[in-house]
C-alpha cells in the first residue's frame, strides 16, 4: 500500500510540475511598405495590415500573459490588433540586449508573444533553446510562427509556416 501511495505521489508531483510550462510564440512583423527604400521605420502595407488581423485569428485560443515588440512601426502595428483583442499592453524590447536566461526567468510559467524581424526572431529562438537551429528568415517571408515550450529542463521548439494565400483561398470556398 505504501508503494502505491508513493507512486501516486510521484505521478501527481510530475503533473503539477507540468503546469509551470512556459510557452513562447515568436513571429516576424507583417508585410511592410517598401515604397521608400530609405525609410528605416516603415508602416505596414495593406497586405501587412490584413496579416496582422489574421494573427488575431491564429492566436484566438491562446491566453497570453505578456506581449513583446521591438520599437518599430511595423512590429507594433503587427501586434497591436492582438494586444487590443487580448487587452494586454505591449512591452518594448531591444533584440541586441536580450539576456535569454533572464527572459526565461521573467516569463516562467507564462504564455508570451514576441514580435521582431527577419534577422532577430530566428536568433531569439536559438537563444531560448541554446542551440543554433534556425537561420535568418528570407526578406519576403512574413509567415513563420515559432513556438518554444519550456517545461522544467525540457525544451521543445517548432516552426510553422502560415500560408495566407492558401488560407484565403480556403475561406473563399466556404
Regions picked out by a protein language model, each given a short descriptive name:
Residues 20-106, 121-124, 131-145, 150-156, ...:
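Active-site-proximal alpha-helix that buttresses catalytic centers in soluble enzyme cores
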Amino acid at each position: 500500500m505504501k508503494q502505491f501511495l508513493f507512486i501516486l505521489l510521484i505521478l501527481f508531483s510530475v503533473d503539477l510540475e507540468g503546469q509551470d510550462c512556459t510557452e513562447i510564440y515568436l513571429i516576424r512583423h507583417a508585410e511592410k511598405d517598401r515604397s521608400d527604400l530609405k525609410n528605416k521605420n516603415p508602416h505596414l502595407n495593406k497586405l501587412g495590415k490584413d496579416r496582422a488581423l489574421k494573427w488575431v485569428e491564429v492566436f484566438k485560443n491562446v491566453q497570453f500573459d505578456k506581449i513583446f515588440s521591438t520599437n518599430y512601426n511595423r512590429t507594433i502595428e503587427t501586434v497591436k490588433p492582438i494586444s487590443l483583442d487580448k487587452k494586454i499592453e505591449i512591452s518594448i524590447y531591444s533584440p541586441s540586449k536580450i539576456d535569454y536566461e533572464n527572459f526565461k526567468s521573467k516569463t516562467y510559467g507564462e504564455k508570451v508573444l514576441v514580435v521582431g524581424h527577419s534577422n532577430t526572431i530566428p536568433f531569439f529562438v536559438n537563444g531560448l533553446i541554446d542551440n543554433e537551429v534556425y537561420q535568418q528568415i528570407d526578406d519576403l517571408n512574413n509567415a513563420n510562427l515559432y513556438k518554444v515550450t519550456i517545461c522544467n529542463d525540457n525544451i521543445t521548439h517548432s516552426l510553422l509556416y502560415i500560408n495566407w494565400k492558401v488560407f484565403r483561398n480556403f475561406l473563399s470556398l466556404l
